[in-house]
Swiss-Prot record:
It is found in: Cell membrane. Belongs to the SEC61-beta family. Involved in protein export. The function of the beta subunit is unknown, but it may be involved in stabilization of the trimeric complex. The chain crosses the membrane at residues 31-50. The keyword Transport applies. Keywords: Cell membrane, Membrane, Protein transport, Translocation, Transmembrane, Transmembrane helix, Transport. Residues 1-30 are cytoplasmic. The keyword Transmembrane applies. Residues 51-53 are extracellular. It is a single-pass membrane protein. It comes from the Archaea. It comes from Haloarcula marismortui (strain ATCC 43049 / DSM 3752 / JCM 8966 / VKM B-1809). This is Preprotein translocase subunit SecG. InterPro entries: Preprot_translocase_SecG (IPR023531), SecG/Sec61-beta/Sbh (IPR016482).
Amino acid sequence: MSGSDGGGLMSSAGLVRYFDAEDQNTIRIDPRTIVATGVMFGLLMLVLNAMIV
C-alpha cells in the first residue's frame, strides 16, 4: 500500500517545475486588472439591459 502512495508526488514534480518556470515571453496581467475588467463588463451589461427594457 505504501508503494502506491509515493507515485503521486513524483508524477507531479514535472508539472510543478513547468509551472514554476518564469518565461520572459509570457503576457503578464495584474489580477486587479482582470477584476476591474470583469466589473466594468458587468456594469456595461446592466446599463445595456436597462436601456433595452
